[in-house]
Amino acid sequence: MTAEEKRATVQLVCVLGAYLAYVAIVLVRAAGGPVTAVDYVAPLVGSILVSIVVSIVVNIVINAVSSTSRDRKDARDRTIDRFGEHSGRWGLIAGATLALILAMLRVDPFWIANALYLGFALAGVTAGLAKLVAYRRGLRTW
């Protein structure tokens, strides 16, 4: 497994884990009541920060332990990274579009914030999955 493939795996796990933890915290705090009544800001910001910190720490540990992590990016890594980021963009666009529509409809800020976070999470998960699939199966040549 190349260093970039390891980074893609770490990114995928961190993004997905943080988002699922956030959703679980909000649902537990709602305890059957309306989710819009839950104080969601601290768990949302906290889950994002924890995801970033864990991702950085795990990548540092992987680089320290693994000899393959010191490899530089080659053309294949750059192509796969670009492919993954382009694949993930639709999630971000969908989340931002949904948030914009919700704002125009004057929906509760809870739903707007969660639409944005869902978009970011979808973008991260889709990009991570696309990169891992590309590393395993290769990219199609046209």
Tell me what each language-model feature is:
Residues M1, E5, R76-R89:
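Membrane interfacial helix-start motif at the N-side
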Residues T2-G46:
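Long, highly hydrophobic alpha-helical transmembrane signal-anchor segments
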Residues C14, A18-Y22, V50-V58, G95, ...:
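Alpha-helical transmembrane segments of multipass membrane proteins
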Residues D39-V57, A115-L122:
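Alpha-helical transmembrane segments
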Residues L44-I48, G84-G91:
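Loop-to-transmembrane-helix entry motif
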Residues N59-T79:
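Membrane-helix interface/capping segments
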Residues L92-A113:
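Alpha-helical transmembrane segments and their membrane-interface junctions
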Residues L116-W142:
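Alpha-helical transmembrane segments and their immediate juxtamembrane interface regions
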